[in-house]
Structures are given as structure tokens and as C-alpha cells.
Amino acid sequence: MNKPVHNNEHRRKRFNKKCPFVSAGWKTIDYKDTETLKKFITERGKILPRRITGVSSRFQGILTLAIKRARHIGFLPFVGED
């Protein structure tokens, strides 16, 4: 007898994303480190969500604050560069 195909058999396997800041042993994120901050924003200048970057909840808040500070000071653009 044939087994019915269930929807969960077609789903992709999930993998655990490790927070890059926790695994590197960071305590804070410096708003002057623009090269690191640019990895967490899109081409249009939006902050990437946790589900894409794998950043922990604690560091997502710190990262968001650092990006906003860098924008206000002028280290990062508010909108993406063409």
C-alpha cells in the first residue's frame, strides 16, 4: 500500500543560525565600525531582520541602535547608494 505524501516531507531542513557577535565574543557594537554595520543593511539602506542575519535578540537591539547612530552622524546613508 502506498503511503500518502505529507506536506512536512517537502519542507526544507532548518539549521541553527549562530549569532556572529556572540560566537566572536563581542560585548558591544561600535557605531564607527561601518564595515561591520554595512553587512547588516540592504542595498536600499534597510536594517536586515534577525531571521535573515541570525543575530540574537540582544545584539539585534544593539545593532539597530548602532546603525541609527551611524546614520545620524553621517557614517552611513539613510537610503541606499545607487
UniProtKB/Swiss-Prot annotation:
Can the keyword Heme be found in this entry's annotation?
A: no
Q: Which InterPro entries match?
A: Ribosomal_bS18, Ribosomal_bS18_CS, Ribosomal_bS18_sf
Q: GO CC annotation: what is one? A: cytosolic small ribosomal subunit
Q: Which organism does this record belong to? A: Chlamydia felis (strain Fe/C-56)
Report what the protein is called: Small ribosomal subunit protein bS18
Q: How does it assemble?
A: Part of the 30S ribosomal subunit. Forms a tight heterodimer with protein bS6.
Q: Would you identify the family this protein belongs to, as annotated? A: Belongs to the bacterial ribosomal protein bS18 family.
Which terms does the record give in the GO molecular function aspect? small ribosomal subunit rRNA binding; structural constituent of ribosome
What high-level taxonomic lineage is stated for the organism? Bacteria, Pseudomonadati, Chlamydiota, Chlamydiia, Chlamydiales
- One example of a Gene Ontology biological process annotation: translation
Does the keyword section mention Ribosomal protein?
yes
Specify the superkingdom: Bacteria
- What are the alphabetically sorted keywords of the record? Ribonucleoprotein, Ribosomal protein, RNA-binding, rRNA-binding
What does this chain do?
Binds as a heterodimer with protein bS6 to the central domain of the 16S rRNA, where it helps stabilize the platform of the 30S subunit.
Which SUPFAM superfamilies does the UniProt entry name for this protein?
Ribosomal protein S18
**Pfam families with a match to the protein in the record:** Ribosomal_S18
